[in-house]
Each structure stands twice: as structure tokens, then as C-alpha cells.
Amino acid sequence: MSRPVPAVFGSVFHAQMPVIAYKDGKWQPTEWQTSADLTLAPGAHALHYGSECFEGLKAFRQADGKIVLFRPTANIARMQQSADILHLPRPETEAYLNALIELVKRAADEIPDAPAALYLRPTLIGTDPVIGK
């Protein structure tokens, strides 16, 4: 079955997104939310200090139909390094990887045939509503 490739890169988003909140000094369980606009407090750290980092990786459909992620552990390590540099909470490897894998499973029918791919953009943002924190 041939799967179409979206006409404009970055213009189509999956219906759901994983959200892993950091509260009371620890990461919370992954929640799946409808992909929608985000709401941030006017004092959100990301808005005043740019405390945000992101990564990018791809999921490819192989000739046999199997879907593979390209170097997810390297992606996670880069995100953790960026979090350390920005003094943001360091994402937990297992939860991050499980969220990526689950997202790819949920989006499997949307992954185009090679050489195209599903592009994932994990993002970490400082949402504390205190400018001086």
C-alpha cells in the first residue's frame, strides 16, 4: 500500500501528543493529550528566558513494512545534555523512549513509504510561571 507524503513539511500533526510534566521535583507519568495549542502563564520561564530545547528524529518504514526509529538513544542523550545546559529538569531515558515508541505505534498508519519518514520533534519547555526562578 502506497502512503502519501504531505505536501508541506511540518504542516501535519498527529491527533495526540505525549506530555510528561515535571512536578514537585519529579517527572509524572506520561499523559496522552489531543494535539492542540498550548496555554502558558504570562510569566512562563520559556517566554522570558527562552528556556526551551528540542530534538528531531525520524521513524522510517522499511521495505518489509517494519517501522524503525533512527538513533533514539542518541536523541535522548542530546535532549538530556541540552536540559543540563539550560538547567531544566533532565528527562528520564525510559519514559522518553517509551513515549517515542508509543507515538510511533499510534501514528503507524500515517508513516509514509520510504524514502519519506515521520518526523518527531520532542520539545522541553520551562513553564514555571515565575520570572525570577
Task: Walk through the language-model features, giving the residues of each.
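Conserved alpha/beta cores of soluble small-molecule-handling proteins
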Residues: M1-K133
